[in-house]
Amino acid sequence: MGIKAYKPTSPGRRQMTVLTFEEITKKEPEKSLLAPLTKKAGRNVYGRITVRHRGGGHKRRYRIIDFKRDKDGIPGKVAAIEYDPNRTAFIALIHYADGEKRYIIAPHGLKVGDIVESGENVDIKVGNALPLRNIPVGTIVHNIELIPGKGGQLVRAAGAAAQLMAKEGDYVHIRMPSGEIRLINANCRATIGQVSNIDHENVKIGKAGRSRWLGIRPTVRGSAMNPVDHPHGGGEGKAPIGHPGPLTPWGKPALGYKTRKKGKASDKFIVKRRK
């Protein structure tokens, strides 16, 4: 997957880069695997903003993804690699031998015509899914479950990869993309390989309008607000923030402040914190 730059016909175009999408083999999605997707604009069920800077963007349809990979013993053939507007990774359309079609997160290197399987003792091959206890130490994995049978929740973004570091009783040690080493139940499933679209991190948005296409709204500086709106607000001209250090809009320290709750139940599963 390459990255394409443009001739500088405008200031926004000068900075912009896009993926070449060489891996994509199919433009239209599988209709049977689509669902409607309504925009939430960062609001919860009470209508209050819980995630700032969200809203607008191009209309999308949700692609139903198989995160569980529970179709054991039935081989599936990769029919297409597709773009998914709802995630940074590409998705693969799988045609199973019994006639069923499913989408999975496409691993890097998976091609049309490849065979993928899931089960207890399938081959250690890119795209195959099996329990962590049956995966050799040192293997690169993604789409990792936290609870057996719930479906993959970890390491699903473009280019992400985790590594199985050790096995210890009912748990395995997984090194996450953040550097954190975590204990995960050995019965949880993971998929072999690294997530596709590894060049995603190198793409430059280039202009404000492209962020708006993605549903990302502007981020206003606190110092540009009034005192009622932000701790940094107010003052004449470019006034200092008036505090020992920068604060969040809610008055909490913005830098160096630990935001993880103390005594969290999952603390015992963290062997080494992220860097």
Swiss-Prot record:
Region Disordered: start-end pairs: 224-275
Alphabetical list of Pfam families matching this protein: Ribosomal_L2, Ribosomal_L2_C
Stretches with biased composition (Basic and acidic residues): 264-275
GO function terms (MF aspect): rRNA binding; structural constituent of ribosome; transferase activity
InterPro entries listed in its UniProt record: NA-bd_OB-fold, Rib_uL2_dom2, Ribosomal_uL2, Ribosomal_uL2_bac/org-type, Ribosomal_uL2_C, Ribosomal_uL2_CS, Ribosomal_uL2_dom3, Ribosomal_uL2_RNA-bd_dom
Family assignment from sequence similarity: Belongs to the universal ribosomal protein uL2 family.
Name assigned to this protein: Large ribosomal subunit protein uL2
